[in-house]
């Protein structure tokens, strides 16, 4: 399995071919996606938190995993159509039948261009149907889903922030006023020092300007034709 940072758009890639898994993983990582790869539909359902039911004779019957099972959020599933055991179409149906995962976009891949197969998958709820080998241009079609997820996460963060503000600061935060005043004090001290420096510079500049004005006045007086005045007096 290939994993990356949790903050990225998370894609679950399902394919029984190691070559195709590596290819799709590299292409998705070029789009800054987090990628998890599995080699079968049953492993994909297990990763999502679904497991095969032991209480049923149906080999395709799946139930929810135990509560303590750690479920990683998946933003999109891309799966091969032809796989042994569980096909991509079967996986698509299982995902869409699940109340917890039906909103996850599912993309089907296949090396065979069969119109009836494509129509069946799209009617079942697949977002896209890509022909193999999948290219980067194909994955660019997934960008709207990435943007939708990003906006959804931003909205959830805003709701969470608003909820915290409405409910007040948790009691776990000790003496917020003292903490805030300390921070303000720390921030004000450098500011006061800067203001003092500015005032000192202004005073120095003012003294220099006055001195310059006096010197210019003296030099002007010195430049007057005193000898001419004496000569006239004579």
From Swiss-Prot:
Annotated keywords: Cytokinin signaling pathway, Nucleus, Phosphoprotein, Transcription, Transcription regulation, Two-component regulatory system
Summary of the tissues where the protein is detected: Predominantly expressed in roots.
SMART domains: REC
Modification type 4-aspartylphosphate: residues: 80
Signal peptide: none
Domain Response regulatory: 10-147
Alphabetical list of InterPro entries matching this protein: ARR-like, CheY-like_superfamily, Sig_transdc_resp-reg_receiver
Pfam families per record: Response_reg (PF00072)
Compartmental location: Nucleus
A single GO cellular-component term on record: nucleus
Single GO BP term: circadian rhythm
Post-translational modification as stated in the protein's UniProt record: Two-component system major event consists of a His-to-Asp phosphorelay between a sensor histidine kinase (HK) and a response regulator (RR). In plants, the His-to-Asp phosphorelay involves an additional intermediate named Histidine-containing phosphotransfer protein (HPt). This multistep phosphorelay consists of a His-Asp-His-Asp sequential transfer of a phosphate group between first a His and an Asp of the HK protein, followed by the transfer to a conserved His of the HPt protein and finally the transfer to an Asp in the receiver domain of the RR protein.
One Gene Ontology molecular-function label: phosphorelay response regulator activity
Entry annotated with the keyword Transcription: yes
Family designation: Belongs to the ARR family. Type-A subfamily.
Function: Functions as a response regulator involved in His-to-Asp phosphorelay signal transduction system. Phosphorylation of the Asp residue in the receiver domain activates the ability of the protein to promote the transcription of target genes. Type-A response regulators seem to act as negative regulators of the cytokinin signaling.
Subunit structure: Interacts with AHP1 and AHP3.
Protein's recorded name: Two-component response regulator ARR9
Organism: Arabidopsis thaliana (Mouse-ear cress)
Taxonomic placement: Eukaryota, Viridiplantae, Streptophyta, Embryophyta, Tracheophyta
The gene coding this protein: ARR9
């Amino acid at each position: 399995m290939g994993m990356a940072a949790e903050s990225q758009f998370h894609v679950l890639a399902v394919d029984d071919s190691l070559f195709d898994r590596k290819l799709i993983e590299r292409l998705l990582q070029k789009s800054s996606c987090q990628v998890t790869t599995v080699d079968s539909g049953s492993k994909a359902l297990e990763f999502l938190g679904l497991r095969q039911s032991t209480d049923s004779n149906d080999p395709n019957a799946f139930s929810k995993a135990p509560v303590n099972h750690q479920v990683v959020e998946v933003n999109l599933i891309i799966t091969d159509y032809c796989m042994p055991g569980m096909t991509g179409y079967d996986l698509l149906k299982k995902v869409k039948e699940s109340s917890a995962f039906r909103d996850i976009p599912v993309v089907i891949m296949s090396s065979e261009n069969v119109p009836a197969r494509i129509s069946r998958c799209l009617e079942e709820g697949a977002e896209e149907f890509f022909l193999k080998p999948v290219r980067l241009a194909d994955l660019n079609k997934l960008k709207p889903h990435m943007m939708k997820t990003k906006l959804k996460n931003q909205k959830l963060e805003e709701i969470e922030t608003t909820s915290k503000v409405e409910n007040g600061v948790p009691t776990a935060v000790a003496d917020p006023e003292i903490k805030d005043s300390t921070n303000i004090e720390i921030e004000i001290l450098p500011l006061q020092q800067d203001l003092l420096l500015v005032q000192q510079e202004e005073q120095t500049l003012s003294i220099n300007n006055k001195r310059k004005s006096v010197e210019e006045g003296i030099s002007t007086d010195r430049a007057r034709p005193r000898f001419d005045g004496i000569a006239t007096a004579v």
